[in-house]
């Protein structure tokens, strides 16, 4: 489930923000769209984002697994993860470096999902 695409859609974001605080925008979408066995991927540089924390709570209510990507130890986000969840923390102080590594992790995850769904394919020289 991709919440980010929905949060960058200005009409969805405006509607959610008008109804309730922005901090619960992702949690509302997880509750509406998430199911047991789904995986929620969240990312927060320092783990202090209330929106992310509430989405994790909503995912756990739905018996979903959460993959949390963060830096600075993950803060409250990391503390809200369960033993069955996955936490990837970038041990660096500079936000720019943390974001660069988290983007690399996201690309690696996408590649792994592609390999699982489509099988290993050799790239040809262009």
PLM regions: where:
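Glycine-rich phosphate-binding loops that contact phosphosugars or nucleotide phosphates
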Residues: 4-123
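N-terminal loops that bind phosphate or other acidic moieties
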Residues: 126
């Amino acid at each position: 489930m991709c919440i980010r695409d929905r949060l960058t859609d200005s009409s969805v974001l405006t509607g959610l923000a008008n109804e309730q605080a922005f901090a619960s925008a992702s949690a509302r979408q997880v509750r509406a769209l998430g199911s047991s066995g789904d995986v929620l991927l969240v990312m927060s540089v320092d783990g202090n984002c209330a929106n992310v924390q509430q989405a994790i709570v909503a995912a756990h209510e739905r018996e979903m697994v959460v993959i949390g990507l963060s830096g600075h130890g993950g803060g409250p986000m990391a503390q809200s993860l369960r033993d069955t969840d996955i936490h990837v923390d970038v041990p660096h102080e500079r936000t720019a470096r943390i974001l660069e590594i988290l983007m690399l992790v996201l690309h690696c995850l996408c590649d792994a999902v592609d390999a699982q769904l489509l099988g290993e394919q050799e790239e040809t020289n262009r």
